Amino acid sequence: MNGFFKNLSLWLVIGLLMVMLFNLFNSPQGPGQSITFSDFSEMVAQGKVTAVTLEGRTVRGLSTDGSPFSSRVPDNYDLTKDLLAHGVDIDVREPEGTPMLMQILISWFPMLLLIAVWIYFMRQMQSGGGRGAMSFGKSKAKLMSDKAAKVTFQDVAGIEEAKEELQEVVQFLKDPHKFQRLGGKIPKGVLLVGPPGTGKTLLARAIAGEANVPFFNLSGSDFVEMFVGVGAARVRDMFEQGKKNAPCIIFIDEIDAVGRHRGAGLGGGHDEREQTLNQLLVEMDGFESTEGVIMVAATNRPDVLDPALLRPGRFDRQVTVPNPDILGRTQILKVHMNKVPLSDSVDAEVIARATPGFSGADLANLVNEAALIAAQLDKRVVEMEDFENAKDKVMMGKPRRSAVISEKERKTTAYHEAGHAVVAMALDGADPVHKVTIIPRGRALGLTMQLPLEDRYTYSKVQLEQNIAILMGGRLAEELVLNQLTTGAGNDIQRATDLARKMICSYGMSDTLGPLTYGENEQEIFLGREITQHKSVSEETARRIDAEVFDIVDRNYKRAKQILTDKMEVLHTMAQALLERETIDADEVIKLMAGEPAETALKPLKKKDERANKPTPTVADDGEQGDQTAKDAVAGSVTQAEDDVEGSTRTATEASTQEVVSKDTPEGDDKDR
């Protein structure tokens, strides 16, 4: 109602101003034709004027034929003598002046207009939901609307333990006496920790949908922006809003943007982010009570958060939200598949087994890609084949059918990928090969993909050395068969070297150097750690480490070489099969490894088989080479052109290696994902 009257008064003022301006610039003119003073004087001299009315310097009159007219008289000209001399009736009137109020309004109108515009902009800057320039000290926390689409815990699957902990917080808000009668206190803060895409923000939205209390949400980057000093003010305002709406929940997404370890930057205590963090620490557990305000935050970098932020009393609970296991993946797939029309052949458990390391967001994307692929083919339901194609697209990238590659490079790529596959299948305990292809995907010319039989969280020394041998298989196949070395194995060598060095320096897998950690963990500057790195390895120890790394790589290089030498016939058969079909699956690889000829080992081609369309054998200039994006424990091996392309190869070992790193070092988890 107030808004109605405000708008009504605004339109009334606008209408009044328009009337004033109209009256000002469109003053009514007297009746009759306006003539020049010369014509008027001539008419008087000829006796054609019978009567006139003088209003200041304006003269109005009637001619002898009865027509009215008007004219202007020059200043300091005595008109009355001429008029009296010719017998013209004269009537003198005071000129119609502008009313006093109108004169005041006209004189003050520009100033009043400027004042009104200034007031308008000041009100706009001080309001507008925190978006005004004068509201930079106001919190940008948004209150979740009741009209927003609600998410409940039934929409969250695959992370049951995290759901249970957060459901307890919701129950406390709904029925606090149940816990208080035994002396229990509600947690002041809950920190959701986990890799990207695991459902941390979705859990927060589920809390908002279940708690039935005010829910404020904002990002960690909303505190520190353009102006200096507003971060602390926004924190204070955020908690003021929370206290007014208590009991309530405040959710801060990506809290590492504001909660990083203090002392990392060059600004010291005057750093804007540190000032904001200090205010956040005080508000969460300081002199003033924040009873009824529960903080929920999410981050995928808990290692860089300030210890004072993580202590009990601030974030009492740290809820880990990991990547789902096979059971969790099955549940997540079923949640997303409920929104898609499916064929009877689709089995969520089979898809879950083939997607180890996938997060909830990855699985949602997989279902969406499968639906898009089916829609492009004008299907009425999504079939299992669509999910298989979507999985290949997500893991390996979209096939580049337009890429033109010379026959020589195709042959090099085929032997490179066959080398990886033969070594992987020959090693006992290695992850089985799922698919081998020389179809360019993304920025890769080919790849070998392995899938583990089950979820894997740790790796033994034997498995890591097997991975190094698999990495060496591509280069060795080129060397043994084609008698050449290409840049395609460059990334294989780099990853094998990195893995061997981690085995020595991080995992203590050296017989001579012992179970020790050598060198500081690699930390990025400004991420909550010291700027300088202290060297903790002597030159003698560094030489011994280099020797150990070389020994591990060389030993597995020779191991892979022996395997390929013994399986040379299989290597030739598999490479020829790749040149013919471009893609072979797990069953075909197993039959080829058993010594079956390609004629019986390879499946008949389908009409729409992706292997039926081969790239034109024309010289290609690939230019840039990059890594293949794959999931944890998922394989990919890339071979590049021998002449002008910088090598960059990725095999299953890379994914396995990075998963090992992610289990033992938090920074490895972030880099991998």
UniProtKB/Swiss-Prot annotation:
The active site is at 417. It is found in: Cell inner membrane. Its EC number is 3.4.24.-. ATP binds at residues 194-201. Its cofactor is Zn(2+). Residues 1-7, 122-673 are cytoplasmic. Binds 1 zinc ion per subunit. GO terms for cellular component: plasma membrane. The chain crosses the membrane at residues 8-28, 101-121. Zn(2+) binds at residues 416, 420, 492. Pfam families: AAA, AAA_lid_3, FtsH_ext, Peptidase_M41. Its main location: membrane. It is a multi-pass membrane protein. One of its GO terms (biological process) is proteolysis. The keyword Membrane applies. In the central section; belongs to the AAA ATPase family. Acts as a processive, ATP-dependent zinc metallopeptidase for both cytoplasmic and membrane proteins. Plays a role in the quality control of integral membrane proteins. This is ATP-dependent zinc metalloprotease FtsH. It comes from Magnetococcus marinus (strain ATCC BAA-1437 / JCM 17883 / MC-1).
